[in-house]
Structures are given as C-alpha cells and as structure tokens.
Regions:
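Gly-rich Lys/Arg/Thr-decorated short loops/hinges at beta-loop-alpha junctions or inter-strand turns
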Residues: 2-6, 45-50, 108, 130-136, ...
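Active-site diphosphate/adenylate-binding microenvironment
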Residues: 17-21, 35-38, 43-45, 356-398
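Anionic-ligand anchoring segments at beta-strand to alpha-helix junctions in alpha/beta enzyme folds, i.e.
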Residues: 30-68, 199-200, 206-284, 384-398
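Glycine-rich beta-alpha junction loops
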Residues: 37-39, 112-113, 170-176, 223-225, ...
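Thiamine diphosphate
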Residues: 41-114, 273-292
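Short beta-strand segments
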Residues: 81-83, 106-111, 142, 169-171, ...
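Glycine-rich, acidic loop regions that bind phosphate or pyrophosphate groups
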Residues: 109-150, 251-354
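Conformationally flexible catalytic loops at phosphate/diphosphate-handling active centers
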Residues: 125, 157-213, 352, 364
Length: 398
C-alpha cells in the first residue's frame, strides 16, 4: 500500500525562514546584504518571496561592511546574512568594527540543524560564543515560535541607547519548520533598559555658566553626535557662542570643515592647530566622544590645562579613559537642545586669533613634484574636479 503523502501545512502556518523575513519587513527593512550558503539557503529563498532587495556581495566580510556603511549613511539598522561556519566567521571583523563604532547592525547567520549542534557537524562553528564580546547582544534561536520576538528585540537593542551590532543565529531545521507566527507589536526586555538619561537642568546651567566664564573654550565633537542626529543642535550652539570645534574621525561631518571655526580633525592624524587648541583650552566640551588613544596620546597630558565637561549617552564611557570635572550621562541631542536655550551670545576673538596663528604656521600642505604623483595631490585634484560632490570611500592604509 502506497504511503500517504504528507498533509500540506495549514494555510495560516508559515515556514520559519518566511517568518524571519516577514519580521524584517515589519521592521521596515528594505535592503539586505548577503552571501548564500547551505545553512542559510532557506532564508535567501524566502527573500525572493518578499519585498526586500537582496544585494549579493562577493564575500561575507564585504557584506557586513556594506551593511555597516548603509547604516552609517542612512541612519537605519543595517542587515546582513551569512551561512554557518566560514560564512559566519567571516563576519567577525565587521561585527567588531560595528561594536567599536557604535553602528546599529543585525547580522543573521544560518546554523547547522539543532540536533547536531555541539557535535562538530559540517561547517559548524559556535558563532554566538565567538562573537559574544564583539556584539551588543546575540541569540541562538531554539524555537521557531521565538523568531518574531527575537527579531523585534534584535532591532530594538541594535538601535537604542548606544547603538551596536546584534547577531541572530538560526539553525537550519528552525528555518524549515512550520508554525502559526505571532508578531509582537512592542518590545519588553526585563534585562535591557537602554539608557535614555536626560541631562538635568542643574547640570546644563553649570555647563552654560562654564562657557560664560571661559576665555578659551573648545568643543571636542565625536560620533555620538551623529548617532543621536544632533548635528543641527551642535551647529546652533556654535552659531550662538562662536566656540571653535575639533572633530574626531567618527565625528567628521557634524560641523562644516569649511567654517572658520572648524579646526578639522584632532589627534594623531589630525591638524596641528586642533591639537594645540586642545592643549591650550581652559574649557573642553567633550560631546559624544570616548577619549580614544589616537586622539589623546598620553592621557595625563591631554587637555591638562582646562576643565573637562563630558556628555555621553553611555555612562560606562564617563571617566573611563579621562576623568572629567563634570561627567553627564545624557542623550547628546537633548543636552544640546537644553544648552542652546541657556547660553548667551558670545565670541572669543583673542582665542580665535591665537588659533589662526597656529593655522597659518602649521597648515595642511605638501610640495608638488614633477616626478611623483603624491597622494595629497591626487586627493586635491579629485576634490577640485568633483567640486566636493563625489562620494569617496577609502580604507585606513597610510
């Protein structure tokens, strides 16, 4: 007697892979960067049945950097997808980079079937354990019913508080299983309460008074301003107070470098006059920075002549590298909005004149030669030809 064919799933049921992709759609995802493999094939097939655009990259490291760039450029959560084993481990450098740069990212990896996890199955790597220290959080999905909740939590964790990468590892059998999904509308994570601190009125009045009393104030602006979408608030502050600005590598773009008050980048690879200004300032307003060693050099010598006010959304950054006279845990956008309502119109002509002397004495310059094409010359020529409108991507080589 012929065996009866398996009954088709009930109409309301969905395959695990489709549930995951539908969860992405519900989070507003429009683009996924991925490279398919055996353990993630179900997910990629589900993508073809969705409205999400899949950008096929040549390598998993390339895909996660593409997702990171997308997140930085758009302000949205970047999403990438890879298979198990070597596919997952190829994401490691990108995850570490996103963690260091506080970039919101959700990385989804396929995994070997649940029944063979821990048995050295083909292309099995414990990617959750491998990435635990370089992600904001990670998940190993062990029930198909948990997929909608986990994806919603992953996006919430990646994009709130101090942003960062979240990894979701999905075994192949979970992708192939069926269930009736329940998509949550809200997120409730008892163990995760993202810091939404807002600077107190008293603290911001103290900052405003410090600015009023200062003779040589300086704003030290970092990537936290970009993450908080607070560039307009920073520019409003500078327009009102006329305080010079230095920027970290991660903070480039928060203030126009063509503005006379911009001292460009600070630190090892920054301008001489930006570093001189740090050393001579009597008040350093550190906004959304981490006092990175490439900026500070010897910590005991950094900004040792001035009072330091450090505002950051992550309390763990306060006093971690450099002890501040006034550390404030706050969303920088909120803090700047409050500060803009308290500061008075001011200017520091003597301080700016002193900085301009350094600027003239130590400009960014190079000597053109007929024998060689210097990198500086190539960049200068490209800038002139494109009138500054081109999007240029670079590595970090010398």
């Amino acid at each position: 007697m012929a065996s009866a064919a398996a009954a088709p799933p009930a109409p309301q049921e969905m395959r695990g892979a489709d549930i995951l992709i539908e969860s992405l759609v519900r989070e507003g995802v429009e683009v996924v960067f991925g490279y398919p493999g055996g353990a993630s094939m179900e997910l990629h097939q589900a993508l073809t049945r969705s409205t999400i655009r899949n950008i096929l990259c040549r390598h998993e490291q390339g895909e996660i950097f593409a997702a990171e760039g997308y997140a930085k450029a758009s302000g949205r959560v970047g999403v990438c997808m890879a298979t198990s084993g070597p596919g997952a481990t190829n994401l490691v450098t990108g995850l570490a980079d996103a963690k260091m740069d506080s970039v919101p990212l959700v990385a989804i990896t396929g995994q070997v079937p649940s029944s063979v996890i821990g048995r050295d199955a083909f292309q099995e790597t414990p990617i959750v354990e491998i990435t635990r220290q370089i992600t904001k959080h990670n998940y190993l999905v062990d029930r198909i019913e948990d997929i909608p909740r986990i994806i919603k939590e992953a996006f919430h964790i990646a994009s709130t508080g101090r942003p960062g990468p979240v990894l979701v590892d999905v075994p192949k059998d979970i992708q192939q299983s069926y269930c009736v999904p329940e998509f949550p509308e809200t997120v409730s994570i008892r163990s995760y309460t993202p810091n939404l601190s807002q600077a107190s009125r008293e603290d911001m009045e103290t900052v405003a008074q410090a600015i009023k009393e200062s003779k040589r104030p300086l704003v030290y602006a970092g990537g936290g301003i970009i993450a908080s979408n607070a560039s307009n608030e920073l520019r409003a502050l500078i327009q009102k107070t006329n305080i010079p600005v230095v920027q970290t590598l991660m903070g480039l773009g928060v203030f126009p470098e063509t503005d006379p008050l911009s001292l460009q980048m600070v630190g090892m690879h920054g301008s001489v006059y930006a570093n001189y200004a740090i050393n001579h300032a009597d008040l350093l307003l550190a906004f959304g920075v981490r006092f990175d060693d490439r900026v500070t050099g010897k910590l005991s010598e950094f900004a040792k002549h001035g009072k330091i006010i450090h505002i950051d959304i992550d309390p763990s950054e306060l006093n971690k590298n450099k002890v501040a006279h006034l550390p404030i845990a706050s969303d920088i956008k909120y803090a700047l909005q409050e500060l803009n309502g308290l500061v008075e119109d001011s200017s520091y002509p003597d301080w700016v004149d002193e900085i301009n002397v350094w600027r003239k004495k130590h400009p960014f310059s190079f000597e053109e030669t007929e024998d060689d094409i210097l990198p500086q010359y190539a960049i200068k020529l490209l800038y002139e030809m494109t009138k500054g409108e081109a999007i240029v991507a670079t590595g970090v080589g010398q």
